[in-house]
Amino acid sequence: MAGLPASGKSSFADYASKELSIPVIAKDDIKEKLFDTIGFKNYSEKTQLDIAAANIMMFTASKILDAGGSVILDNNFEDRNLENLSKVIENHPCNVITVRFDCEMKEAYRRYTQRDKDPSRHPGHVLMTCYPPVEGVEDAVKDMTEQSFCEKYTRRGTMRFSMGKLIVVDATDFKSVSYPQILKQLKDSLV
């Protein structure tokens, strides 16, 4: 599953995982475990946890594929992920399908900022200076403008990412997204 942050890819990944009985490995879930286990004291350390989470995701996917299983990867994949994914695929010939959730940037940004204000969102994704929070230390909270959001994800190639067969989902309006229909496309692509 690929696409912009807050585009709906994780919700569909969980749905597809249950319907297909295929495990989903979500980089954000791994990051949250790393935030809670290791934490970070500055933005550089937080970035290292992001890199570690991506490496753990690829390592785990390789192990599942080694055992003859299938796997769903959930991440806002970017151009920089192509090399590592290509290596996994080279070592494990498999049917690769990208389900990319596209969304108008303005709407993705609105959802992104709304999600970061949700109390159920893990604070490690929002805090920039340190996690867990240290009493008496004011932490910077990410504050991205719509313009910087658009530039960041355009520059990184999130909206053009694709490996293998591509299924594009316009997720600008969640009400128009049909999970059963996407699942049917996915199943048809697996044949």
Predicted regions, residues:
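Hydrophobic anchor at the beta1->P-loop junction of P-loop NTPases
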Residues: M1
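The conserved Walker
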Residues: L4-P5
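Conserved glycine(s) of the Walker
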Residues: G8
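Conserved substrate/cofactor phosphate-moiety recognition/catalytic segment
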Residues: S11-D66
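Glycine-rich phosphate-binding loop used to anchor ATP phosphates in small-molecule kinases
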Residues: L49-V96
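Conserved phosphate-donor/acceptor-positioning beta-strand/loop module used by diverse small-molecule
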Residues: H92-T113
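Small-molecule kinase domains that catalyze NTP-dependent phosphoryl transfer to phosphate-bearing small molecules
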Residues: K117-V177
